[in-house]
Regions:
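Ligand-recognition surfaces built from glycine- and aromatic
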Residues: 30, 186-212
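Secretory/extracellular carbohydrate-interaction modules
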Residues: 36, 72-133, 138
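Extracellular glycan-recognition surfaces and repeat-rich motifs
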Residues: 38-69, 76-77
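Extracellular carbohydrate-recognition regions
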Residues: 25-47, 205
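Short tryptophan-centered beta-strand motifs in secreted/extracellular beta-sheet-rich domains
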Residues: 31, 93-95, 155-171
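Short, solvent-exposed beta-strand-to-loop segments that form ligand-recognition rims
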Residues: 172-193
């Protein structure tokens, strides 16, 4: 009995230490200390494919953490904005986003294991299609892994989170896990960031990430 008791507490302590370490490594950015019309110095923005995306910090009175958000108002095949100097192999990335408009798409997404504009993973939610999707990009080509129906509302804040470890990928939207699977197309450390598609006008806030 004592042996089992000790094993239980040893396991509980190990789990607590793991959770503490993960929480300690988490970083959150809300863009509120930045001047509207600017970009954070440590973010790099671009596009996979063609187009002219426009990323900048703007004031938004509806922001989950007021007053500022990071907003994409231009258009391009797949616009992205990443924390280029962050390198995470296994961990999580999360953001609150609000799809504001777009005739072709109204998407907000996350990227991780981002090597460059041609190689990375994407999880995204789309208000026009009402779904959550998982992709990987290789040689600049977006490849669908899986998508599922999900209620995504325009002009409403949503939370998108991805947890990734080895081959395992879990995509959580508004607190519910919609995708849980294994994929090993992209391995090793990479940057993390946010993503849109086509003419999506999307606001982002409370971007957070952490490594295991």
């Amino acid at each position: 009995m004592d042996g089992n008791h000790n094993k239980f507490w040893s396991l509980a302590l190990s789990i607590a230490m793991m959770l503490t370490a993960t929480a300690a490594s988490a970083v959150e950015e809300n863009f509120d200390a930045l001047k509207p019309g600017t970009l954070p110095d440590d973010w790099t923005c671009g596009v996979t494919g063609k187009g002219s995306p426009v990323w900048k910090v703007e004031t938004d009175t509806s922001a989950p953490s007021k007053p500022n958000v990071l907003k994409q108002t231009g258009s391009g095949t797949f616009p992205w904005c990443v924390k280029q100097l962050v390198r995470i192999t296994d961990g999580f990335v999360e953001v609150k986003f609000k799809p504001l408009g777009g005739r072709e798409d109204q998407a907000g997404g996350l990227v991780w294991r981002f090597k460059d504009g041609d190689t990375y993973y994407i999880a995204r939610a789309n208000a026009l299609e009402n779904n959550v999707s998982l992709y990987h990009v290789e040689k600049g080509r977006r490849i669908t892994i899986k998508y599922v129906h999900a209620p995504v509302t325009t002009n409403q804040w949503h939370t998108l989170r991805v947890e990734f470890s080895g081959k395992a990928i879990n995509v959580i939207f508004d607190g519910k896990r919609y995708l849980g699977l294994e994929n090993d197309q992209i391995t090793g450390a990479g940057a993390v960031g946010v993503w849109t598609k086509a003419d999506s006008v999307t606001a982002f806030d409370d971007f957070s990430y952490g490594g295991q």
